[in-house]
Amino acid sequence: MSDLKKAAQKAIELMDLTTLNDDDTDQKVIELCHKAKTPAGNTAAICIYPRFIPIARKTLNELGCEDIKIATVTNFPHGNDDIAIAVLETRAAVAYGADEVDVVFPYRSLMEGNETLGFELVKACKEACGDDAILKVIIESGVLEDPALIRKASELCIDAGADFIKTSTGKVPVNATIEAAEIMMTVISEKNTKVGFKPAGGVRDAAAAGEFLGLAARLLGDDWATPATFRFGASSLLVNLLHTLELGEEAKGPQGY
């Protein structure tokens, strides 16, 4: 198998197949669940809005895909600075049955010089997840932009108990970049290699996925990237990966992200 095909296969196994669109419906989420069961194996998870968790759970169970995790989003997409609301949304997501919660860090507060708020929000949302769900924290690296801010956000999230740090919401002009990924995974290598990394948005093909995986191998070791420590947040990427593996276009995802 070529390196490109190996990257494509691994990226499918590490994918959070995502639909986070304003026009999402039960039917679109059902279709997403079917796409997550790919000819090359199941994706690691799907990522959907909280209200669709029950129908997704029912569909995945019917497909015999109980191993596919259900991720959802809170404090999304703007990363507001109201801790109480972020916690309420996170508790509700867990009550709906989410396995994983992707919460948006209050990145604008950090840009204004407030480091405490982000730490406290992540800490409180981690407590809200308890033992029922893992917490991924979206730092919106494309808006933070400054390497020092990307590093600081990553450090604060890890110190506050995040299980993963994630680049982006996919709702801003600049999403996952190799430059941000290098900073974020360097912080993981320094602080806690059990913390995971999730590039989201803008990873369009197997070659790009391979670049992120290669960076992870260089910074954290060849065997580090597993579903427990690495995810790709993506929708249209799956089509390219299946095409790379010569498995056709059985999985046309929602456009974007």
Swiss-Prot record:
Protein name: Deoxyribose-phosphate aldolase
Family: Belongs to the DeoC/FbaB aldolase family. DeoC type 2 subfamily.
Pfam families cross-referenced by the UniProt entry: DeoC (PF01791)
GO CC aspect terms: cytoplasm
Record flagged with keyword Membrane: no
Protein's cellular compartments: Cytoplasm
Entry's EC annotation: 4.1.2.4
Keyword annotations: Cytoplasm, Lyase, Schiff base
Example GO biological process: deoxyribonucleotide catabolic process
GO MF term set: deoxyribose-phosphate aldolase activity
Catalytic activity annotation: 2-deoxy-D-ribose 5-phosphate = D-glyceraldehyde 3-phosphate + acetaldehyde
Gene3D superfamilies documented for this protein: Aldolase class I
Main localization of the protein described in the UniProt heading: cytoplasm
Protein function: Catalyzes a reversible aldol reaction between acetaldehyde and D-glyceraldehyde 3-phosphate to generate 2-deoxy-D-ribose 5-phosphate.
Organism: Shewanella woodyi (strain ATCC 51908 / MS32)
S-S bridge residues: none
Catalytic residues in the record: D102, K166, K198
Keyword Ribosomal protein: no
SUPFAM superfamilies: Aldolase (SSF51569)
SMART domains in the record: DeoC
Pathway involvement of the protein, from the record: Carbohydrate degradation; 2-deoxy-D-ribose 1-phosphate degradation; D-glyceraldehyde 3-phosphate and acetaldehyde from 2-deoxy-alpha-D-ribose 1-phosphate: step 2/2
UniProt xrefs under InterPro entries: Aldolase_TIM, DeoC, DeoC/FbaB/LacD_aldolase, DeoC_typeII
